């Protein structure tokens, strides 16, 4: 039996940077707006970030000296209208953040959408597929803690005893997850033990 967890970040990835106004390192988050300069059909585009403690802003470069003919029309429209989904997309775009030497701060919250069969029995072995919708600062361990309602210590004991298999603690702790699918196995009892779901015995 297969259960699918689709994991999606909530909000934005914060960036740590010295704020000249606060005169200390602060967290910055996207303001929700883009800055676009156009000169002779050449575009410069930035995402505007704002200090979480004051109104100081900092621009992260998205496109530099880009000819208008080379940008997708729909993307250009989304940039011009400060589309919220596009702001979030670039907030998690690793290539963009690296190019701007952005220092990541903290780990975003996330939601998990779960899909599983209507029929499930207590002694079944369950294959869990974790789908990361976009790359962000999260570990499989954090996802398991939330979904199984177990502590890190309890999960470690389940891995060591074989109740959770197909994955190691090293893999669970890694925060370098890509937008891909990860799989492991566990018993139906372990999956639903803390969820107040009664499983039938057949």
Where are these regions (language model features)?
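Extended interfacial segments that mediate partner engagement and assembly in macromolecular machines
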Residues: 69-131, 137
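A generic structural signal for beta-strand entry/edge sites
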Residues: 44-48, 125-127, 181
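A basic, amphipathic helix-loop patch mediating RNA/tRNA/ribosome contacts
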Residues: 132-186
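A structural detector for beta-sheet-dominated domains
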Residues: 52, 61, 131-133, 187
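N-terminal cysteine/histidine-rich coordination modules
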Residues: 1-86
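N-terminal short leaders/motifs
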Residues: 1-8, 130-138
């Amino acid at each position: 039996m297969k259960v699918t967890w689709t994991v999606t970040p909530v909000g934005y990835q914060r960036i740590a940077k010295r704020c000249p106004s606060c005169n200390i390192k602060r967290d910055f988050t996207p303001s929700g707006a883009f800055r676009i300069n156009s000169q002779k059909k050449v575009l410069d585009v930035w995402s505007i970030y704002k200090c979480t403690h004051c109104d100081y802003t900092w621009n992260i470069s998205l496109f530099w000296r880009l000819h208008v003919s080379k940008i997708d029309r729909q993307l250009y429209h989304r940039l011009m209208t400060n589309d919220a989904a596009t702001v979030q997309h670039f907030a998690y775009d690793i290539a963009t953040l690296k190019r701007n030497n952005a220092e990541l701060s903290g780990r975003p919250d996330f939601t998990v959408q779960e899909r599983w069969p209507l029929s499930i029995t207590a002694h079944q072995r369950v294959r869990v597929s974790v789908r990361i919708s976009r790359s962000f600062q999260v570990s499989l361990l954090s996802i398991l803690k939330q979904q199984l309602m177990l502590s890190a210590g309890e999960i470690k004991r389940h891995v060591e005893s074989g109740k959770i298999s197909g994955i190691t603690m090293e893999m669970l702790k890694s925060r370098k997850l890509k937008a891909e699918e990860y799989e492991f196995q566990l018993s139906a009892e372990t999956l639903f033990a803390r969820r107040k779901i009664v499983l039938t015995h057949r």
